[in-house]
């Protein structure tokens, strides 16, 4: 592992990866959501034989194709960054992290890449049934791509199914299904997939309402609104349900992230869920005694219910997690951060001693050092932490991002519910205020998604892999100036791609569907 690394290299490497990931996530959710919607529309065409549904599906398919292509380009760049900027990470866990990504490339990506050609160019060339199957297989392939990538990400949040090999200084997978089917992975996948469906439904609803505002393609717009409103409402409700499951898993596996999400410094029994509050700017240290939240409005005991499924359950705060001493569910006493750091340093030293003993041919000493390493490996990453305060993520960023995500999630439930009601009553074509609300709401789904990823990734700092490998020990030994240069090159490239996509989408929307 790297010692005495330049902190600016860490910051710029993180910034570059965050830039790539956030730009990439501007394209992925629309692919996931719009793809399913166009497949539903083509299914309606297949069932009814109504040519109007065919033309509707073909229009949204054009927009899907543009977005899909640029999403692939940004995703490839992100995968290469693991090797260029995060070589220590790649070495330490490449055997595990690489497996889901390999499956994604070999199975899911090839699947969607194969059938997307039939989906776009197979109209009138293959049977209706085969074309419909190709459309669904393209969307299933895209969804499977997301599955394997999110399994890899979930493993970083909750490393399972692996063991550490001190001979190679690498983690090795021993239980594939523990990695692939961990509760964190499943909750993360469905929550993320469904949030993409919301983006797709919001996009279709907003664009369709624009046609109503312009008094164009009325029948097309009403057909699209019907599908988008039903699909969006179902997706919004399911997203809320999976969000509850995700919060529970965070409480079990990443309690510091949960504490940051709630701005909770002092835990207790029957803790309330903060609805609205402001972070106190005078709070500068976890144990300075300053009240962390201002103007707090909370739901009594609800955080305990979300975290432990009991109204009076104990939920630790940041101070409790740093200082330890509280009783865990298994009856043991929680270690303090200093105790974990000491155990981590012991594990790192035991690894070094083990390798020295092997080199010297002292098998007995090697066995003793390996036993010490195994006993303390759960805290291996803490050995790289110098100050317990480093274990606290950005509370302000995590706290506000979580509330933005949740509030927008509630907004979309209401938006799709009202849209569906007006559509069923035959009033949405004349409801100008609703049309404008839907149109202006298109960016909100993207904002909610970005906020969710901020909660997930900023909230788990300082860890690249929870408790095992901190971000500071994961990077490649590069010149910070080179990372700065590529950061701005990528910023320009991604911005150009985004502008190009927006221009193409706007032109296609302005042209409208074939009548």
Segments from the language model and where they lie:
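Membrane-interface interhelical loops and short amphipathic "cap" helices
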Residues: 1-22, 49-56, 80-102, 154-190, ...
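N-terminal signal-anchor module of multipass membrane proteins
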Residues: 2-47, 55-59, 64-71
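Membrane-interfacial loop-to-helix junctions in multi-pass inner-membrane proteins
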Residues: 48-66, 92-98, 102, 122-140, ...
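Hydrophobic alpha-helical membrane-insertion segments
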Residues: 65-74, 136-156, 232-243, 354-358, ...
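Membrane-interface helix-loop-helix modules in multi-pass inner-membrane proteins
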Residues: 67-137, 154, 458-462
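Internal alpha-helical transmembrane segments
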Residues: 117-125, 130-136, 147-156, 173-176, ...
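Aromatic-rich transmembrane-lumenal/periplasmic boundary elements in polytopic membrane proteins
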Residues: 152, 234-342
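C-terminal substrate/ligand-recognition segments
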Residues: 390-453, 484-508
């Amino acid at each position: 592992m790297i010692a005495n690394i330049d902190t600016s290299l860490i910051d710029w490497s993180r910034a570059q990866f965050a830039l790539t990931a956030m730009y990439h996530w501007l394209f992925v959710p629309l692919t996931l959501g719009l793809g399913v919607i166009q497949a539903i529309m083509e299914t309606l065409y297949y069932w009814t034989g109504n040519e109007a549904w065919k033309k509707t599906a073909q229009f949204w398919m054009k927009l899907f194709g543009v977005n899909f292509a640029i999403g692939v380009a940004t995703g490839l760049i992100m995968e290469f960054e693991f090797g260029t900027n995060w070589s220590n990470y790649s070495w330490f866990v490449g055997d595990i992290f690489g497996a889901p990504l390999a499956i994604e490339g070999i199975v899911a990506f090839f699947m969607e890449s194969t059938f997307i050609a039939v989906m776009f160019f197979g109209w009138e060339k293959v049977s209706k049934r085969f074309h419909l199957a190709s459309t669904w297989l393209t969307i299933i392939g895209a969804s499977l791509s997301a599955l394997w990538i999110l399994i890899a990400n979930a493993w970083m949040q909750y490393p399972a199914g692996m063991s550490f090999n001190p001979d190679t200084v690498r983690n090795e997978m021993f239980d594939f299904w523990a990695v692939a089917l961990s509760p964190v992975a499943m909750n993360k996948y469905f929550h993320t997939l469904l949030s993409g469906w919301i983006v797709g439904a919001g996009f279709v609803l907003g664009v369709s309402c624009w046609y109503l505002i312009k008094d164009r393609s009325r029948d097309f717009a009403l057909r699209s609104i019907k599908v988008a409103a039903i699909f969006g409402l179902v997706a919004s409700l399911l997203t809320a349900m999976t969000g509850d499951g995700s919060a529970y898993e965070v409480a079990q596996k990443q309690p510091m992230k949960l504490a940051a999400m709630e701005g909770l410094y002092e835990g207790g029994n029957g803790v309330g869920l903060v609805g609205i509050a402001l972070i106190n700017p005078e709070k500068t240290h976890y144990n300075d005694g300053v009240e962390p939240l201002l103007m707090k409005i909370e739901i009594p005991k609800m955080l305990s219910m979300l975290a432990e499924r009991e109204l009076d359950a104990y939920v630790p705060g940041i101070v409790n997690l740093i200082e330890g001493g509280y009783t865990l569910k298994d009856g043991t006493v929680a270690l303090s951060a200093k105790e974990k750091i000491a155990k981590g340093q012991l594990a790192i030293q035991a690894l070094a001693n083990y390798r020295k003993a092997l080199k010297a041919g002292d098998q007995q000493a090697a066995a003793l050092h390996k036993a010490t390493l195994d006993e303390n490996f759960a805290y291996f990453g803490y050995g790289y932490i110098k100050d317990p305060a480093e274990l606290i993520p950005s509370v302000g960023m995590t706290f506000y991002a979580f509330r933005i995500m949740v509030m927008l999630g509630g907004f979309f439930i209401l938006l799709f519910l009202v849209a569906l009601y007006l559509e069923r009553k035959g009033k949405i074509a004349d409801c100008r205020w609703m049309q404008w609300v839907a149109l202006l709401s298109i960016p909100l789904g993207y904002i909610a998604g970005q906020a969710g990823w901020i909660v997930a990734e900023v909230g788990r700092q300082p860890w690249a892999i929870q408790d095992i490998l901190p971000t500071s020990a994961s990077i490649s030994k590069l010149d910070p100036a080179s990372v700065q240069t590529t950061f701005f090159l990528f910023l320009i490239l991604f911005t150009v791609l985004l502008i190009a996509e927006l221009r193409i989408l706007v032109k296609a929307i302005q042209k409208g569907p074939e009548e």
